[in-house]
Amino acid sequence: MHANLFNQNASKKDVFLHNLRSNNGRYKRYIKAPLRYGGGKSLAVGLIVEYIPNGVRRIISPFIGGGSVEIACATELGLEVLGFDIFDILVNFYQVLLKDKQALYNNLLSLEPTRETYNIIKQELKAHYKKECVLDPLILARDYYFNFNLSYGPGFLGWMSKIYTDKQRYLNALLKIRGFNTPSLKVECSSFEEVLLAYPNDFFYLAPLYVLENSKMFKGIYPMRNFPIHHNGFKHEVLAHMLKRHKEPFILSYNDCEFVRNAYKDFKILEPSWQYTMGQGEIRMGKNRLERGDNNHVKQSHELLIIKE
């Protein structure tokens, strides 16, 4: 770290990491990503950015999800970031946000965070998801955000959390929509196989869905616990095979389990620790966590960072 981070030689990365670090030496949560997201990396951003090579000018992310790392790299480091996801409704949200954040903000501002409104929006979103209707992209983005960010968990087509009926909390959250300014981020709908084949000469950041078998994760959650169609059957072996053949550096966030450790044993494996934002503010604890003896409601990470240098 430079002695004076604010001289001409200080990189954007150095300055960002310096500002993100708390007095106790640990990184603070990165708070500019607008979505609450299961498995989100808002507290891991500093740890991950540390390992991004200094010469990188573009980052490819096949699993944008909540986008904390991707948004930080685009907003704070000024890097070009190409984000992808297989979930078209999530991709539409980002595309609308990037195209016209003010229209999205205004539409969300017109909604009251009540259970009645939530149920109406949920049914409208569900009808689109089941192909019973086709929502305009702006309305779809509005409905997705309102349903997802105000839900317990959070979860797509989930149930409204009591703590998000607080109107001031809702208005504060919308400030992230209004203030979003990340022109070097682009988001498209595509599978990880297509993305890895399309960008063989780029640096990748990947946060794939967790391995369920023999891991601490009991059930898939994408896009929602009751129908984890993107989670169940995810091709972990295919991803490992393709990454072993990828000739450029990458950083991979994965859950800690036997399969992952064996599949990526030839790469650098780190064991960082952070808290998940999923369920932040909730005090209920699930049956599985009670049975294994968790003594509070704060969910700790059980992830690995896998690095190809």
Residue ranges and their predicted role:
Residues 229-309:
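Long, positively charged, glycine-interspersed low-complexity recognition regions
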Residues 65-66, 173-174, 254-258:
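Short, polar loop motifs at secondary-structure junctions
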Residues 50, 57-126, 166-167:
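SAM cofactor-binding core of SAM-dependent methyltransferases
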